[in-house]
Amino acid sequence: MISRAQGCLLGQLAGDALGGLVEFQSPEEIRRSYPKGVRDLADGGTWNTIAGQPTDDSEMALLLARMLVKNGSYDPEAARKEYQYWLNSDPFDCGMTISAGLQGNPDSNSQANGAMMRVSPLGIFGARFALNQVAEWAMQDAALTHPNLICQQANALFTMGIAHSITSVCEANELYKSIRQWAVDLPVETKLLDIIDRAVNEPPADYIHQQGWVLIAFQNALYQLIHSTNFEEGVVNTIMHGGDTDTNAAICGALLGAVYGREAIPAQWLNSLQNCRPEAGHPHVQHPRPKCFWPVDVLELAEELCLTVSI
């Protein structure tokens, strides 16, 4: 259980940081720069970050994780306060839907991926709870910034998948079948069920022109879950499609990490995360951030999420 919890949070963080190296680029641009795939966490990239540094995706996820450990429970208002703190911390990137939602103007038409990109810690924490409770929490968290029903339902399925994988030690194909059945049972919107079905045979048709769409991220994660031979290939394959690479890879990495566990995470990725300290005054740090956004304690944090007693 601990290994899969750690794999999930490591996958979230590593996928985010790795994808951040080529965010917004086309597949052709990425292949020219990385003919063998984007495989090492390094300084630089779209946001000129240091190796392993989280983008907005995982900064929000880290705050959610720390809140869950501190409080021993999920509360949407407590989560809102954490996300508001993040917004006020002058992040170097922030999606429009998140910004509008946290400023009191949520966009009910947006189907952006900003809720799913941060929610994986809730799946880890929720592994000891009934899946219907996990789904309720995930929908509440999405509604803070992404009230569209597609976003809420996709959040529920994704988080349930993480929680179930951590507790049941199921294989990838079994997990997909469970997610498909939950989608029928809830039931979810037809558009969401359609991409779940299509993930059996194909990845999203276009990662570029609607980049940032939650259904691209979710279909990709499910496709990689079914078809990738291992954790690393699933994350790298995701990034090579281009577009919103950091978020797509963070979501895919969290789901696959919950299946494959800590042992599947490349050593270079783990070492980079555990030594990533974007501290003010360091000559290589272009975006210094408060310590709560550093991923150095990722293994301990994931374990605490598993062991925290609900109050």
Task: State what each model feature region is.
Residues 1-311:
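Structured, active/binding-site neighborhoods that engage oxygen-rich ligands
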